[in-house]
Amino acid sequence: MPLLHLLRQNPVIAAVKDNASLQLAIDSECQFISVLYGNICTISNIVKKIKNAGKYAFIHVDLLEGASNKEVVIQFLKLVTEADGIISTKASMLKAARAEGFFCIHRLFIVDSISFHNIDKQVAQSNPDCIEILPGCMPKVLGWVTEKIRQPLIAGGLVCDEEDARNAINAGVVALSTTNTGVWTLAKKLL
């Protein structure tokens, strides 16, 4: 089954920033885990724990310590991990990830109207499978983005409670990515 279809059926992505939150995510109902920590020496074991739990692993490559902003890090991740996807703010990294067969998530920060109006250009360069918009607690803006681009959206950052989660889903996002363990418990409730 295509990963995007599975994501729609499991709309809460547990974002983890340390080993403690990784274990909580593995024990949660969330089927997708975004790894926001680690380094080139530990990432293989982090992903292995996720895969051994039968879950999907996305690596935020920009946050991986010891890795450069060069495309060779994507080849490295393909060789040493079984990750399913790559998250990045950089189009060049996502192009390299696509070439290696990874599911690609372009993370974009919308802080003003200029960043909103530049979304099309950035997405055209990266051609991702999904776009993660931060902060994810802006339902009006999320709605504008869903009308502007064809790729499915993930709401990330500052999704603090069930109200934020439902507002984002109602605005048209396919999933939420959050470090908030309280929102993780909504994994099946949001369907």
From Swiss-Prot:
Species lineage: Bacteria, Pseudomonadati, Pseudomonadota, Gammaproteobacteria, Enterobacterales
Family according to the record: To B.subtilis GlpP.
One Gene Ontology term from the biological process aspect of the record: glycerol metabolic process
Protein name as annotated: Uncharacterized protein YgcP
The organism of origin for this protein: Escherichia coli (strain K12)
Pfam family, one: G3P_antiterm
InterPro entries on file: Aldolase_TIM (IPR013785), GlpP (IPR006699)
